[in-house]
């Protein structure tokens, strides 16, 4: 109930009748209290723009969405195994969509690359036999993963991969206005059918003279829908599908096991750039750090990755997050301690945000910094390994980041009451 009221309050305060005032006051509802609390709570760090104005366009557009304008704002997130279950991204997505409008689920990969790969507030799955590839744990020789670092392939006639809007009653995700799916065209590629709500819309021959990521977009009446890809013959490789509506917030939660900047720069750079350009993010967030073991290499690789991002998305805002603390592997019977390197990694990544003149949010500090992981593990916010975060921590992080985002928007609206109005 609290979440429903959160969105309703925003609608009343922010989306006033434009006929009465071409630029009515915009009140940003920054919650006074957190729903997710713990004895380990600390002050939530603010979002910092080290470029001074690098995030201006993003917050301007966010204010336009808040004012009820017919605008779709896209956010992309890259994370490691802690993001593969979509729980942190899902919490952020859900809270932002309840506040600003549901713009669609965003990207979800076809197939099940990990047993726990289940996105929030959307339904998806496969039937029949599929091979799932990803750039870190299950690589494929040709390196064709598209921009999300994952793919699924089947040569079994009748095998399906599908995605569907959330079940009725879900807080968000129950409607979609378009599906844009991606697949691999290549020599000796197979054929597949595209079904919308049980009706065959297309039969696609994926054979081509050279390997290439291709896209198919299907517009539908805004509402509940199901997209199914059905293998007819030959080998078919799929990447993913983006579910969108005409306005509101859409958030792509991309998580790959053991992801780090080095692995991302080892992807086919043309595929990565093309995919990012097509998704056209207004804000791209990079959250990795748990799987970075060479700070020196990190400092040489991260600039390469940021250059790729900026070339693919010249108008976007960018933000780095520090990674959370985690428990160092100890001998059996010893008291768990934090991995000392994570304190350095947080500091190093902050320096990179300063160097690149982009946005920064200190997740490491938001969870209590060095020494916090053993406490969170003991209180069961982390999984038993002390490395992977659990559902309560996913919700905890997501709520605090959204709080920081709303707080930053509120500060900007206080400074410029006409933020988001037509100039």
Give the ranges of each region predicted by the language model.
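Catalytic His-Asp segment of secreted/periplasmic serine-dependent ester chemistry enzymes
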Residues: 268-269, 325-423
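Cleaved targeting-peptide boundary
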Residues: 19-26
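Conserved SGNH/GDSL esterase-like catalytic core that processes O-acyl groups on lipids
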Residues: 74, 82-304
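Bacterial N-terminal signal peptides that target proteins for export
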Residues: 1-6
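Surface-exposed patches in mature extracellular/periplasmic domains of secreted proteins
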Residues: 99-111, 321, 363, 412-416
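Hydrophobic h-region of N-terminal signal peptides that target proteins for export
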Residues: 9-18
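Conserved, compact domain cores that house catalytic/ligand-binding motifs in diverse enzymes
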Residues: 55-56, 68-77, 84, 88, ...
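Membrane/wall-proximal cationic-aromatic binding patches
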Residues: 28-77, 133-136, 148, 157-159
């Amino acid at each position: 109930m609290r979440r429903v009221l959160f969105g309703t309050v925003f609608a009343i305060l922010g989306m006033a009748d434009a006929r009465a005032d071409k630029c009515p006051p915009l009140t940003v509802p920054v919650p006074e209290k957190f729903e997710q609390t713990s004895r380990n709570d600390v002050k939530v760090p603010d979002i910092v723009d080290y470029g001074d104005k690098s995030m201006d366009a993003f917050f301007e557009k966010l204010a336009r969405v808040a004012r009820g304008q017919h605008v779709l704002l896209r956010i992309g997130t890259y994370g490691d195994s802690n993001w593969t279950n979509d729980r942190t991204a899902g919490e952020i997505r859900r809270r932002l969509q309840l506040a600003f409008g549901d713009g669609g689920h965003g990207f979800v990969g076809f197939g099940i690359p990990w047993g726990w790969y289940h996105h929030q507030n959307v339904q998806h799955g496969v039937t029949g036999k599929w091979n799932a590839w990803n750039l870190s744990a299950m690589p494929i020789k040709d390196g064709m993963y598209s921009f999300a670092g994952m793919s699924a392939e089947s040569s079994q006639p009748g095998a399906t991969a599908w995605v569907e809007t959330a079940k009725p009653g879900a807080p968000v995700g129950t409607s979609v206005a378009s599906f844009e799916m991606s697949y691999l065209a290549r020599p000796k590629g197979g054929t597949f059918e595209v079904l919308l709500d049980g009706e065959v819309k297309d039969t696609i021959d994926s054979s081509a003279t050279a390997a290439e990521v291709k896209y198919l977009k299907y517009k539908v009446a805004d509402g509940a829908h199901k997209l199914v890809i059905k293998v007819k013959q030959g080998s078919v490789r799929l990447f993913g599908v983006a579910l969108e509506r005409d306005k509101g917030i859409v958030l792509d939660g991309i998580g790959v096991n053991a992801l780090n900047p080095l692995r991302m720069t080892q992807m086919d750079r043309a595929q990565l750039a093309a995919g990012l350009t097509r998704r056209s993010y207004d804000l791209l967030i990079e959250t990795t750090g748990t799987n970075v073991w060479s700070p020196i290499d990190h400092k040489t690789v991260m600039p390469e990755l940021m250059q790729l991002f900026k070339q693919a998305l010249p108008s976007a805002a960018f933000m780095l997050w520090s990674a959370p603390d985690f428990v160092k592997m100890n001998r059996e019977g010893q008291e768990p301690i934090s991995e000392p390197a994570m304190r350095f990694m947080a500091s190093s990544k902050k320096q990179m945000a300063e160097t690149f003149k982009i946005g920064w949010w200190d997740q490491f500090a938001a969870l209590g910094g060095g020494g916090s992981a053993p406490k969170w593990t003991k209180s069961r916010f982390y999984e038993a390994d002390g490395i992977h975060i659990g559902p309560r921590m996913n919700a905890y992080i997501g709520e605090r980041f959204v709080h920081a985002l709303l707080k930053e928007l509120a500060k900007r609206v206080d400074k410029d009451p006409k933020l988001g109005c037509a100039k």
